[in-house]
Swiss-Prot record:
NCBIfam families: PRK00668.1
One function term, GO molecular function aspect: ATP binding
Organism field: Helicobacter hepaticus (strain ATCC 51449 / 3B1)
Lineage: Bacteria, Pseudomonadati, Campylobacterota, Epsilonproteobacteria, Campylobacterales
SMART domains listed in its UniProt record: NDK
Protein's job: Major role in the synthesis of nucleoside triphosphates other than ATP. The ATP gamma phosphate is transferred to the NDP beta phosphate via a ping-pong mechanism, using a phosphorylated active-site intermediate.
Keywords noted in UniProt: ATP-binding, Cytoplasm, Kinase, Magnesium, Metal-binding, Nucleotide metabolism, Nucleotide-binding, Phosphoprotein, Transferase
BP GO terms, sorted: CTP biosynthetic process; GTP biosynthetic process; UTP biosynthetic process
Compartments it resides in: Cytoplasm
Family as reported in the entry's similarity comment: Belongs to the NDK family.
Listed EC numbers: 2.7.4.6
Protein name per the record: Nucleoside diphosphate kinase
Length: 137
């Protein structure tokens, strides 16, 4: 069984669609092994998105991610990384297929409702960033 990280971003939390997004995961055989709601600090967001530090959108991304609470989850299932990415849809909600999380709940390429790990290796690192092993069950 694979594990992947999912973050429900501040825009979706503010809209009150946490439950609807979780339902998408559970309805598609992705089990929630760990979950917490938290407010990222600037330091947290900068460290988590450090891979994008030199990109022009980095400051806006960090500002957005600290603009409100997020819900961080570990999802588990067969092909969890790709299944989660398929459920999320394209990064730009205007390009996301109908019925995907971003098509249904995202506002823009910046406020795009969810984050999901893009590889198994990144999933392991991202999960470890937010959760200790004893928190995952």
């Amino acid at each position: 069984m694979e594990q992947t990280l999912s973050i429900i971003k501040p825009d979706a939390v503010k809209k009150g669609v946490i439950g609807k997004i979780i339902d998408r995961f559970e309805s598609n055989n992705l089990r929630i092994c760990a979950m917490k709601k938290l407010q990222l600090t600037r330091c947290d967001a900068e460290a988590f998105y450090a891979i994008h530090k030199e990109r022009p959108f980095f400051k806006d991304l960090v500002d957005f991610m600290i603009s409100g609470p997020v819900v961080v989850m570990v999802l588990e299932g067969n092909n969890a990384v790709m299944k989660n990415r398929d459920l999320m849809g394209a990064t730009n909600p205007k390009e996301a297929e109908a019925g995907t999380i971003r098509a249904d709940f995202a506002q823009s390429i910046d406020a795009n409702a969810v984050h999901g790990s893009d590889s198994l290796e990144n999933a392991k690192n991202e999960i470890a960033f937010f959760f200790s092993t004893r928190e995952i069950c």
